[in-house]
């Protein structure tokens, strides 16, 4: 039994579902908080509470969203490893346009998550220092989003295909392959991480010198850097790349210890972006089986920046004076609709990808092992499956909205009961005459 369960996709699917459920759960909590935020009175304590709750829910969702493509890369690599035809069916066959829909939804998730962080800076005193970076971050995200959703082949008439010289556009076709798409999504992850770092340090003042930081913090930072180098080795990076990235990590650590932590973080971002872009371009000149392995090199570089960059940020801003307290409840109301968008996109995306995972088997119970001879052994068309998934998503959201409404009624009834008890409570103590 264990030999049958422990197959190529067992662990990748488990990890992918685990991370996706974290992101999905966080987005639903954030959507509930958004509903309560909009239903509360302005400048009320309740609105401040649900603003905080929405931020926490969105934070959990983003923490799941950022590593989710990494788990997807692993799952895709194992699918190709099990059977290359299965991978071709997934990315270049009948399901290829489904991944264009996936790109649109995930792009909306990244853009929405970043937009929410940028709007959240309006409630943070001192965050106006970093708002000048927002147009550049938005530009990077938009370009990467456009690259990611560009299809490799276009639906075109015979006349249009003749004008293009084939089914592939001479320019846009270059951006339709996985080398470009892997590069784009990794740059989007780095950009989202940078937005979060700017948000996190929004109300932080001057940095505390490293000489005043605890020895334990410095040792922990050094250990995390060393573990990052080990991670690069474990993930199968070639020795020359491990050596280069290890040197950059050590230099970033030295800069952090020399009170230049932000420079060290910038160096890490530059290193990771260079690795991602280099292997994205190099992927055009190698075979597909080699190109698939490049995604791991790109992912490991980004993952190292996420881990070490976060550690440096925590240490260098530890104990820093605050410019002011966060004004919970002062975020613009349009930010709450972003939280609704995130919850809807996550739900729809999970349904569509479930169709892709199940439909990949086509007319097999186990691909190329046990054939399905039943009358229902067919794969629904993308349009039919998308319609069914959309109806299911709508029903799910209506059920969740009904639960939200019931919870709101219960809370409201409890509050009214408490108010009546306060009014009816007898006044104790002596009178003025006494």
What do these predicted ranges mean?
Residues 1-434:
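Polytopic transmembrane helical bundles with strong interfacial aromatic enrichment
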């Amino acid at each position: 039994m264990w030999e049958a369960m422990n197959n190529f996709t067992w662990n990748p699917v488990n990890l992918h579902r685990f991370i996706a459920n974290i992101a999905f759960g966080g987005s639903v909590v954030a959507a509930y908080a958004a509903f309560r935020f909009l239903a509360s009175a302005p400048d009320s304590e309740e609105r401040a509470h649900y603003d905080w709750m929405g931020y926490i829910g969105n934070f959990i969702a983003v923490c799941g969203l950022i590593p989710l493509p990494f788990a997807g890369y692993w799952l895709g690599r194992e699918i190709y490893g099990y059977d290359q035809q299965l991978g071709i069916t997934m990315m270049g066959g009948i399901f290829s346009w489904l991944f264009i829909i996936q790109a649109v939804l995930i792009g909306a998730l990244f853009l929405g998550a970043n937009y929410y962080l940028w709007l959240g800076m309006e409630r943070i005193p001192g965050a106006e220092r970093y708002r000048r970076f927002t147009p550049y971050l938005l530009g990077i995200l938009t370009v990467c989003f456009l690259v990611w959703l560009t299809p490799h082949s276009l639906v075109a008439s015979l006349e249009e295909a003749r004008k293009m010289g084939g089914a592939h556009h001479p320019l846009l076709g270059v951006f339709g392959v996985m080398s470009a798409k892997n590069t784009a999504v990794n740059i989007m992850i780095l950009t989202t991480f940078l937005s979060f770092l700017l948000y996190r340090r929004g109300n932080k003042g001057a940095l505390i010198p490293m000489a005043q930081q605890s020895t334990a913090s410095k040792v922990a930072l050094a250990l995390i850097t060393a573990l990052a180098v080990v991670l690069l080795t474990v993930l199968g990076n070639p020795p020359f790349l491990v050596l280069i990235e290890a040197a950059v990590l050590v230099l970033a650590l030295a800069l952090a210890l020399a009170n230049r932590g932000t420079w060290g973080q910038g160096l890490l971002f530059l290193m990771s972006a260079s690795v991602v872009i280099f292997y994205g371009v190099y992927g055009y000149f190698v075979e597909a089986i080699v190109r698939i392995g490049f995604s791991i090199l790109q992912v490991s570089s980004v993952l190292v920046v996420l881990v070490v960059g976060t550690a440096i940020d925590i240490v260098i801003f530890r104990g820093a004076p605050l410019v002011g307290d966060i004004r919970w409840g002062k975020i613009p109301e349009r930010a709450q609709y972003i939280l609704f968008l995130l919850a809807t996109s996550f739900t729809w995306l999970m349904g569509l990808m479930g169709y892709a995972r199940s439909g990949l088997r086509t007319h097999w119970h186990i691909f190329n092992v046990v054939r399905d001879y039943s009358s229902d052994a067919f794969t629904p068309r993308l349009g039919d499956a998308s319609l069914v998934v959309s109806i299911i998503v709508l029903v799910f959201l209506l059920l969740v909205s009904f639960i939200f409404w019931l919870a709101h009624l219960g809370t409201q009834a409890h509050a009214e009961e408490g108010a009546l008890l306060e009014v009816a409570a007898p006044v104790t103590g002596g009178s003025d005459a006494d």
